[in-house]
Amino acid sequence: LSFPALPFFTAGLRPELFAGAGTQSAHRVLLVTALSVLVLAGFAFRANGLSSEGLSDDELNKLSAVNEYRTQGLTSANGEHPLLMKALLTVSVIAAEKWNQTSLVAGHPELNVPVETSLRFPVALFGAFAAVLIYLVAAELFGLETGLIAAALWAFDPLAIGFNRIAKEDTFLIFFFLLANFFWLRGQRVAESQPERNPERFYWATAAAFGAMLASKYVPMLIAITVSYNYAFQRIPVTRWVIGKKRFLKFFFVMGVVFLICNPTILLPGTWKAMSNFTSYRNMAHDSYEFMGGLYPHRFQDWFRGEPWYFYFALIATKLPVLSLFSFGLGLGLLFRRKSGDGRYFLLLWFSLWALSFMIPGGKFTRYLTSVLPAILITAAIGVQFAARRLGRLCARVFENESLKVYARAALASLVIISAFWSAARAAPHYRLYMSVLGGGHAKAGAYFPQDEFYDAYMQDVMIEIAKRARPDARVAGELPSLASYYAQRANRPDLACVEFSDPQELEKLVPGDFLIDARGRTYLNNQVMLARLRQVSQPVLTISVGSVPAAYVYVLDQTSLAALRGELQNRER
């Protein structure tokens, strides 16, 4: 962390804020070693205990798509999402199955790779390597020290780790976005400071990375961040970083070709039908989202009637380690100082355009923060570096020893990084349940964003316990019938009929001795009254926890609880 920063050139300003860092390059071996340690340590956090939590309903949809690809070839399965991630998941699942069939695993069953692990492994891998891309982007904008601090914060941040341990598209989205912008910013550097070189190869590499990004998740607005950053320099007379219309046309052509190569299922009619159903909410199973104890409509067009605009502010305030949060606040203020250099415009555009796209719509999920979390951590790294330099100068002045500067700077940066490491270590392996002291600590785990914090992690254990107790052909009611059925099959109880209890027809079919799952985060506007009535007249026979946090309550239904669910008790009282 005491490495001097790289020289920095953009179309305008040099970041005077960190000018004291010097312009020598760090020893390449030391730099590669530092990044390798961060990637390996970050991967260890992300990959350890991947099967400690059961699959979510979303992840089961991915597994179903993988199985369909294997039996039928490329289809429109899970077609509302692009192919690239599902293709990587398919490779991982097949590789794990081949591994599990080896004689080595036969003799050592503990080496067997569960499907939960194989499905999530590619996400964990890409999430760990994203630390390198964060370093590269931050180093281009603000220098080597900021890049290393930002990479370390990503490697050990509980939020980042939690998002990188679920089989969803957001990690791949941000990976390719970062890759694209590293090429884009390197092209800027070449255009401005090395006129003898042609920067075009960096533009085409950017376009290719964006094609892969869109083949990971359909979030084209992120491209606007990159293009807007270039546009911000076009009115500067001396700028050399000019793309031009012809090159932009070629840029989007390259992006489109790579997109089609990585996502050929976009050409299937069934894919467009699935996307239409998704965007029109015809496949939307649930009508709301629980946030801080309240239920909110959850559609995109609910706008300010949906989840509150401060949803992501609450997430950052309660889930970032305290020192990382304070560093982010300091760094955010520094982004409005001219001395921070032109790189600050990239982060400001990132924050602004992301906020317009994700904070105003009514439908929000915590994992959407993944696409702006690197910007938050880079900003935090700016704050750490600024404070560390101030501390270094203070120590040198107080003790009249210039050599103390380096040690003081390294000590403060290390303190912030170690605090993130410690937070992640304490939260393992249930990182999504991490709560900072400002959020109320572990006592408040699962209280603010229960659907995303638990993410159905309890369902495997729930069905194992029900399978032990249920009579033949019993019905199991809950809000996740497909997932319950999957784990019932895994528990050798294919006879169990798993149904959605908020469906009036299925509710009428329940009889005494059937089971009902009341899971945290799965209370909705259409079932909250029924669950409230059930809780008043009955007690769960089982409580399933994720770690030490109660996550789901299992009821064995009797005549009284069935009458409460159906509202018959209230009708009698009237």
Please give the residue ranges for each predicted region:
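Short helix- or helix-capping micro-motifs
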Residues: 39-42, 150-155, 162, 182, ...
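Transmembrane-lumen/periplasm boundary regions of multi-pass, lipid-linked membrane glycan transferases
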Residues: 45, 65-67, 81, 87-88, ...
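Short acidic/glycine- and proline-prone juxtamembrane loop motifs at membrane-interface regions
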Residues: 56-57, 159, 165-172
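Transmembrane-helix signature of polytopic, membrane-embedded enzymes
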Residues: 101-110, 134-156, 175, 194-197, ...
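Transmembrane-helix motifs of polytopic, lipid-linked glycan transferases
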Residues: 113, 117, 121-141, 179, ...
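Specific aromatic-rich, kink-prone transmembrane helix
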Residues: 133, 172-192, 205, 209-210, ...
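Membrane-interface transmembrane helices that cradle and orient dolichyl/undecaprenyl
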Residues: 139-141, 145, 180-203, 213, ...
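Aromatic/acidic, Gly/Pro-rich catalytic loop(s) in extracytoplasmic/lumenal soluble domains
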Residues: 497-574
